[in-house]
């Protein structure tokens, strides 16, 4: 708990710290003001009612009214400070967390689910805000109210005060037991919330797949399981709280009744005045109410602690992929690619083994092979989404680990089969990598990707907002917009991972012609299964089980009569025994 509070405090700007301290000081002062009216009620009873002297009545009532109004005004100011400052603190925290996510490496996103990260950015951060705006001052308020009331009542009659607070040690023990038992339940509940949000997020993102397989009922059952597990985790916490709260309430009410009874005996014996007993009845709630609130405050504290811990995991996560201290700046990427005895393993499992090849600037390298052979991993290593386990990947004769990440990735334009388009206009999606593009340049790149014809037929043309992931467009249309986006950055290395898998042969030929006549020179890195997409490449690699099984030009690989030749025969309908 201490670490979470310290982390939150450290992330508050100095002005918000000051305002928060001022708000808490106001809270302490308003707790002192709580003593005024009970003290005046003593005079009202003893000096006015019992003495039958109406002269002080108006003055006492005016002071009581002024105290009440002043206290409410101060508390209003306090709440304004706490609410506005907490919102600003969380705004800055959310901004910093989002920045952390931008520079986290791919391994981080491999481990953390989208729904879980969304929960940390929203619900968990909101509990941090709730701590600043409510929990912190309510704890201080409860402690100060109890202490001030106890001290003041001691000056009135220490024996009766002792009777009123005698159950404090018992309440402290009950509170400690409750706090220990509820903490793991909150951690469990937080995990169930994350699982439920992940299930909802995946269902919404994959709604087309759900409908395509008619799995609506299955998804309903799956979400129902997550939803019920979350509800059950809540109920377990409530069960603990419902056991704790009645015990507190019973003890507090019992001691209040005993206090009134004993106070009455003191009056009969002349050891206490009616006005002094009025003070005890008026302030007994100030001594007992903090214990009543304790259950809710412990609940809130445990939720805050659990949520803040989840946020801190993201906040303190260190990216494994970052600029080296001696990273080199380059004026312009030329596009030479070299894989030098590269091996790559994830959790000990080999993905690539001893891969070596080189491509000169302006050349085209194509990679094919069975699914799971490691083709896409080559791209990930080239853009340094991951670091090699052995060997080196070089761009322009410089190890990619010595490149500045922004320069390295800024020189690579990537278009993949699994297209992600933003909920933005067509123009905004194409110009995503270069916000300075003019509309004419956007149109030129969409034309080269053979996307201009269908884009111009959209309701608002290039200003048409396309849905998340390109909802409303066909697979081939999404791929062509993604290709236009990759071309628009004028990359030195153009990566195409099955980019034309969803387009027809005529469109593919048009795109290939356009790529051969780009207004800038670039090295093309193509991953494909179609022979037609790679037959003109300067170097073709066949990757099987993470190793290069074959390499050469189209003609050379046909002569080897290996995997490439077999694929060629199958795709062109040539019986292998007749193929030359």
What are these regions (language model features)?
Residues 25-26, 33-49, 54, 58, ...:
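Juxtamembrane helix-loop junctions of ABC transporter transmembrane domains
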Residues 67-86, 133, 137-144, 165-191, ...:
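Alpha-helical transmembrane segments of multi-pass membrane proteins
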Residues 1-36, 41, 49-62, 70, ...:
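Membrane-integrated ABC transporters
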Residues 53-59, 152-166, 236-309, 314-315:
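Helix-loop-helix
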